[in-house]
Amino acid sequence: MPVFHTKTIEGILEPVAQQVSRLVILHEEAEDGNAVLDLTLPVGAVSRAVDNLIKVGYDTCHSSDDRILQADMPPALQRVEASSRLLEDACHMLRADPYSSVARKKLIEGARGILQGTSALLLSFDESEVRKIIRGCRKVLDYLAVAEVIESMDDLAQFVKDISPWLTRVSRNIDAREKELTHQVHREILLRCMDTVKTLSPIMICAMKIFIQITEESQRGQQEAAENRNYLAQRMTDEMNEIIRVLQLTTYDEDEWDSDNVTVMRKALSAAQSLLTSALDWLADSRGRAGATGEKAIRRIVDYSERIAARALPEDARLIRATVSDITSMTDSLCELRNQGGDSQGLASGCANRLKELVGTKEISGILPSALTNTQRTGGTHPAHTVTGRLEQALRWMDNPGVDDNGLGLQAVKAMTSEAGNLQPIYSHLQNVRKFVDLCVEIDRQADQLADLEHRGLGNPPAAHAIRNQLRNKLRELVDIMKKVITDRVVEDFADISTPLKQFVDAVYASPTIVNRELSFEEKAHNLDDHSSRCANTALLVAKCGPCKNKKTVEAIIEAANQVNAMTPQVIKAGKIRLHNDSDSANLHFDNLRREYSDVLNRLRSHVDDAIDTSDFIRASEQAMRQYTVYCENAIRNNEPQQMVDNTSQIARFGNRVLMTAKNEADNSEEPSFVHRVNNAARRLHSAIPPMVNQAKQVALNPRHGGNAQSWRDANEHLLSAVRQVGDAITGAGGSRPPSQNLLVESVPPKAPTSPIVHDRIYIREDIPTPPRPPPPVEISPPPRPPPPPETDDEEETRAFWERYPLLGASSQPILSAAHNLHQELRQWSSHENEIVAAAKRMAILMARLSQLVRGEGGTKKDLVDCAKAIADSSEEVTRLAVQLARQCTVIKMRMTLLQVCERIPTIATQLKILSTVKATMLGSQATIGPYGQPIDGSEEDEEAMQQLVLNAQNLMQSVKDTVRAAEAASIKIRTNSGLRLRWIRKPMWSNF
């Protein structure tokens, strides 16, 4: 079936699909009794192109040493050649008889074969190119596997000489491949992994060198050096394996992160079923080689089965994993036997039977389909990955009392209170801990009470609505508390990420003559480990419980936190090596790991800063500074100079963090007034920190000196005011800040009357009594709010359309369900003066119509082709508007996010047109259409085409949903003089009913 994971394949298939779609329409018109036009010229052009393609294909086969390519490409070439002959025969027959039914059948079969054969041909060649890259990757892996046995400098020199050319070749190939891929996520993974390999390779070689030196010179630290080397080699191995995995991917699921269990399982089952035929064909062919398409199909079925097992019920998961284990071991043995030339048919037959038992056939129900059915019966949904997402799920449950969400809303509430319980140990406001715990208990109680009422069919009475209102308020209160706790923790733990490392470095490089040198090293190593652990744990809390909903940011936080945890012991071991070995190699080795650790920690802090609200962070920083101000006052009162120094140092660190945040905000914006305002506030803050520190030093020298203490208080208050001004500059609240309620009002004695003052012959007497105070104005009620803009005809048509396609009917139809999900996202916005929302709503309706057409529920093949083309046109409109909005957005990160999510849409829409053309060539060739559009008694090809079409439609709807969300966020930060007008009017809830 067509695949589109490279730009080259997509560029070749699109014009072919356009020609095939014309032939499909001609075929359908002929079925209505019309004569088919003379096709001699277009068919002749196709034949010449096919002849040239076949010649190039066979030349490639003969010149290649890839035996898998030599086995896979000829069948595709033969199909293209046979399909071309069918077109030629149809052309000749139609010229003799324009109404010939046999000729029309040959025409459609030839068109279908040309498209699918060309796709198979391109995929076969592309897989051969991927295997070339993977061979280089495996060569690097082979060298990494022997890194542990290199024990001499000569061996190391040879190792570097051998591995360097392969690393260069792999890097060059990955850079070229990345530019070819159409899936953005795959491109990013390849680049990230390759960059990591480039960074780690010199560090690993240096680690190998220091290990050899320590071993040869019998110095201390041999075990630490070996662990450093093994860690780096393993990390490089993991990155290379990830590169190999991504290189072999041809599809990407855009919304798997947000999908419920049933949706993910259904997609995985569909993918596994589409691979079964290829796997069984390879098992039946005794000449099938390891690494061929069929063997890879088995491996992918195993991967999809693991994905299903991870979401299935426990008993189903155990059965799936046991079957997968059997299939994996049998496949490994089969590959080994075939490579040795032994008799493998018995083993292949057994493996085929196990595969059928796992995936299912028309005769066998299958373990995976049964697991999906059982999960559907129990609900199969899972809460979102973040607290913010879970809050949305819970509110959706409460806002739709008549809709059965299979317990998802209740699960989301329980997950929120469970995460809140994890925050309890770090809840700093001890006097409020009891209140925090009671709030969680009350939320659980009310959620259970509401679920019980709905279970008994009492979800709509006033009592249930009262519980909903209370539960909504309590959930929002809980989320606010969690957000504050996490922000406070971020402020505290990330205030200074450099000092623990700097102190550890000083301990590592301490002179051997210093007393208690090793004791100091152990202390600083423990401090570094504790600091890293706190940073990583806090970051993981931000990822799970923080306000960020961005998948990319959350995953980046988790990855960086895990790297910090893994690298910390390696840095300590490298420091221990340097402590006992004062050599250039030991210095270089330690510096390499220290810099890598520092980079990862800074990257983690950057991701955490992106995940929390800037204004909340600055307010929390100011509050923390005030708390440490209290500690300083206690130090002054108790005559504790060291405490004064420590606490003022922490205040200065908080101030510097706010300063760094302000600079980041200014760098992230292109709005001149905002940048000017923030930079001015940052300059005032920058100038306020040194005076506070200097005055604190004077207090530390003489805590009893009242003048010094007052000078410090004034400087500290000035610093706190500067921090507050930075927050006001970022939020834009400075101009509207209410006057201070703590002003000191002095009583001024009345003055004696003075002589008149003349101003341009007007006499003003200061002793003239003031006129009486006028009566208060009569209270006038404010004018009524203007009514919302009237619903347009488009809005009425949209509502009427979706009333005919309710959510309950969409649950068993994946394409309609994807369209419905987009509609649910868009129904909150009015399309009045918002072209992005209007175009996205059209896309949702068109996708629902496409679902009807591919299921054979009315319409013609021409309707299917035209519907796909209309979806592609609307996709271009959404992309154009999103790009236009992004260009006017003044916040760089928002702009990049919007551009990244909308750039996927045209590619997916083009793929949809091609897949719809493939489906159009198959419509009418089956007697019955199943619940997911699959043929009950049709070809395996049609089923595979349907699965790809479903996945493509789901990806397109998810990308449009992401684009609308990013556009709404970016709309509040557009240039005021841009002339761009996008109104985001949130529709009242009653308008959706």
UniProtKB/Swiss-Prot annotation:
Q: Which GO terms describe its cellular component?
A: adherens junction; cytoplasm; cytoskeleton; plasma membrane
Q: Which GO terms describe its biological process?
A: cell adhesion
Just give the chief location class: cytoplasm
What keywords are annotated for this sequence in UniProt? Actin-binding, Cell adhesion, Cell junction, Cell membrane, Cytoplasm, Cytoskeleton, Membrane, Repeat
- Role description: Involved in cell adhesion. May be involved in the attachment of the actin-based microfilaments to the plasma membrane.
Instruction: Indicate the family of this protein.
Output: Belongs to the vinculin/alpha-catenin family.
Q: Which PANTHER family match?
A: VINCULIN
Protein's name in the database: Vinculin
- Give the organism, scientific name: Brugia malayi (Filarial nematode worm)
- Organism phylogeny: Eukaryota, Metazoa, Ecdysozoa, Nematoda, Chromadorea
